[in-house]
Amino acid sequence: MQVVYELAPVIAEIISAHCPGTRAREEFVHACIHGEWNDATAMVEGMLAEPWHLRGYQESRLREFLELLQVDQSVLVRQ
């Protein structure tokens, strides 16, 4: 889970860059801090739904975040 928290600020910046003038960044950070992973996942999936708006490493970072969430969630379910 630590890796997810380390990557969250990077994802927040990507979201902020694509949603200027909104509270999207704050909402994403809030979701991560409070463990609202369904909300965080929905925001990232929304960004990935329009990949033509993403630049450089952004798409790969968003996908990496989703993969890490899936791994962490499956570990928590097994426990």
Positions of predicted regions on the chain:
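C-terminal-biased regions
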Residues: 1-79
